[in-house]
Regions:
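Catalytic-loop of the protein kinase fold
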Residues: 102-118
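Conserved N-lobe beta3->alphaC-helix segment of eukaryotic protein kinase catalytic domains
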Residues: 12-36
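AlphaC helix of the protein kinase catalytic domain
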Residues: 69-81
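A short, aromatic-enriched beta-strand patch in the conserved N-lobe beta-sheet
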Residues: 46-48
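Activation segment signature within eukaryotic-like protein kinase domains
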Residues: 90-91
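Conserved short submotifs of the Hanks-type protein kinase catalytic core
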Residues: 53-67
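Conserved activation segment of eukaryotic-like protein kinases, specifically the C-terminal portion
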Residues: 141-154
Length: 157
């Protein structure tokens, strides 16, 4: 369930219906969000457990401009190009958010347009950190994220 107020996004994760790995991912997202405060990362406000529905409830900053995938689809539908300055602004802010994550050794692992949120004022917010991981040492061995966005070298026959 998702509920939106003017400044915050509230969503429930029904834990009873999730696998152990999915539960771990939900809790991991809360931990990571709570550890970072950056203007280009979707802001975490609070999380709590709701006994009645056995749900993890997460309150997040609301990006009132939707996501980048929707914005791209709207431009395609109307056959309009996005202005180059706008594209560079989005790119710069995405890199700024990723840099903030990487400084804390957090790897997003699911970067795609649907996980890049926008405000009406033009601020970019990276979100959906549920498969993110804190890098311990060396190269991560697990493959995760959205398969169609995976680089060719991670595809296996």
């Amino acid at each position: 369930m998702i509920s939106i107020s003017h400044y915050r996004l509230f969503y429930k994760v029904k834990l009873a219906k999730l696998t152990t790995k999915e539960k771990d991912n939900a809790i991991n997202e809360v931990r990571i969000l709570a550890s970072i405060n950056h203007e280009n990362i979707a802001g975490y406000k609070e999380a709590f457990f709701e006994q009645g529905s056995s749900s993890l409830c997460i309150v997040m900053e609301y990006a009132d401009g939707g996501d980048l995938q929707t914005k791209i689809n709207q431009h395609k539908k109307t056959m309009q190009y996005m202005k180059e300055e706008y594209i560079w602004s989005i790119f710069y802010q995405m890199v700024s958010g990723l840099f903030a994550l990487h400084k804390k050794k957090i790897v997003h692992r699911d970067i795609k347009c649907a996980n890049v949120f926008l405000t009406k004022k033009g601020t970019v917010k990276l979100g959906d950190l549920n498969v993110s991981k804190i890098a311990k040492a060396g190269v991560m061995q697990t493959q995760t994220g959205t398969p169609y966005y995976a680089s060719p070298e991670v595809w296996k026959d």
